[in-house]
């Protein structure tokens, strides 16, 4: 059975790194990193353009197409609104695929520090750091972390995987174990 694996977690926790590793080790899997879609939209750096509203439906369509073709999707994306998670779960269900949720977590202080230590110098990385700083920096990240924890009780099938700093391979092994369970 094909799967749509939603890899959730606070910004900078390692979702994209683990998703890339997973896709590399599972040929044919689509690494649907929504952040990589933003730069494809003209004017994406202007917050007033609401690019998320454009790329989320595109991501849903990409996931549906991939699953319909009998291939897996891994989605490394912070989502703390149940309605957004439900949309991806619905796509999986409609395409006859399993919907698997894994939430990568560290303590709040460590999660915020990991965002600050992130070395992504891509256009998206610079843009994202600028937006976070503009909207409160660590306070914004703390709020995002709290919102993620608040929705977890409503997602009983989500498996939490603890992430230690500089332990990518160990965390990847925990991810694989969570997906087998």
What is each PLM-predicted segment?
Residues 10:
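P-loop (Walker A) phosphate-binding loop of NTP-binding proteins
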Residues 95-115:
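Conserved phosphate-donor/acceptor-positioning beta-strand/loop module used by diverse small-molecule
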Residues 7:
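Hydrophobic anchor at the beta1->P-loop junction of P-loop NTPases
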Residues 54-95, 99:
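Glycine-rich phosphate-binding loop used to anchor ATP phosphates in small-molecule kinases
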Residues 1-4, 71:
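Pre-Walker A (Motif I) flank of P-loop NTPase domains
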Residues 120-171:
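Small-molecule kinase domains that catalyze NTP-dependent phosphoryl transfer to phosphate-bearing small molecules
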Residues 13-69:
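Conserved substrate/cofactor phosphate-moiety recognition/catalytic segment
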Residues 31, 99-101, 158-161:
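Conserved beta-strand scaffold positions in the cores of enzyme catalytic domains, especially
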């Amino acid at each position: 059975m094909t799967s749509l694996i939603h890899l959730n977690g606070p910004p900078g926790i390692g979702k994209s790194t683990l998703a890339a590793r997973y896709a590399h080790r599972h040929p044919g899997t689509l690494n649907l990193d929504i952040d990589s879609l933003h730069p494809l939209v003209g004017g994406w750096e202007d917050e007033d353009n609401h690019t998320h509203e454009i790329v989320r439906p595109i991501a849903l369509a990409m996931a549906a197409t991939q699953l319909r073709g009998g291939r897996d999707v891994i989605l490394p994306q912070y989502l703390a609104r149940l309605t957004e998670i439900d949309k991806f779960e619905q796509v999986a269900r409609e395409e006859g695929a399993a919907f698997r949720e894994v939430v990568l977590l560290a303590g709040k202080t460590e999660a915020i520090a990991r965002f600050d230590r992130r070395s992504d110098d891509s256009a998206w990385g610079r843009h994202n750091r600028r937006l976070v700083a503009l909207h409160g920096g660590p306070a914004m990240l703390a709020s995002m972390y709290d919102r993620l924890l608040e929705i977890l009780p409503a997602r009983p099938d989500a498996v939490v995987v603890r992430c230690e700093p500089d332990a990518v391979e160990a965390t990847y092994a925990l991810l694989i174990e969570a997906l087998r369970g």
